[in-house]
Amino acid sequence: MNTEPVNKCGLKREDFQTTVQGKKTDLFVLRNNQGNEVAVTNYGGAVVAIMMPDKDGNYANLVQGHDNIQDVINSPEPFLSVLIGRYGNRIKEGKFTLHGKEYQLACNNGKNHLHGGPTGFHAHVWDATRMSDNAVVLKYTSPYGEEGFSGELTVWVAYTLTDDNEFVIKYQATTNKMTICNLTHHAFFSIQGIANPTPTIDNIICQVNADYYLPIDETSIPTGEILKVEGTPFDFRTPKPIGQDINADDEQIKNGSGYDHNYVLNKKEEGELSFAARIKDPVSCRTMEVYTTEPGLQMYTGNFLADFKGQHGATFPRRSAVCFEAQKFPDTPNHPYFPSCRLCPGETYTQKTIYKFGVEK
């Protein structure tokens, strides 16, 4: 058994090796020619470390995660930096109609369905194939009826760390029966470093390339409206600190307990890979840019993080991380004018999302 620690984040492969659901789990460390690293496990596709330098060359882990497989499996935050499917985000009351048939999904977020259900893609061991030093491909076949979904869905996800410090996630999925498909990744980013003694994201400078967003009701389900961000706390078209308006006296901020809303990304054409968002830590000068082919981007500011211990004893309190979940829109099956999430036999679902890291002094 390989016990060699990861050079920069100190994780040990043996701490991620066990058997779950009859399948073996493991740790895969992706490295580029700069010596930077992304560490992932095939349990739920969890990203457990992203090691990048600051303006002085000092390294820190920029994603919240755990340092052993049992803590990943039993995390107080089940969606901590994992793959999400079959349906990312919420579906109202877990109900939708497809081709004249009504489906009832598991409801695990009050009366609503969230992120594929309690045993969604985050809670399964994926088959893993190491492609190179900087790439791994994960595969999972979701059987017919899993969490109430129709059709058998086969999913491939490729993780790659490029020499330009881009963490690239490519998704593909096929089905044998008409179904819905909305995949995403729920990485909790702390570009200030997860071990920072004051881990708040309030001072992180954020930009989101969206003129519109989806308002939500008190259960976080879209109302069906598509509203302008102009003149609201949701206007990040010009960079501003995340904390500037996060506690504003605003109904939408109150409904989300902060930011937990889908942005309608500005696109010249459907499916183009384009700039979605950017954050910068003014202290370390680290930056992260998000590019995606998806029409929507859920910005979630860790409003419900439960102040638990994570990797190497780091504490993950409320609003210590921000998520940028590239996706179709929430509750799309119940809003026919939202971008379609339907997938039919013979079609291939595809998505590409890039998280690009850098330093800007």
Locate each region found by the language model.
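An exposed, glycine/acidic-rich loop-and-rim segment of catalytic or binding clefts
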Residues: N2-K361
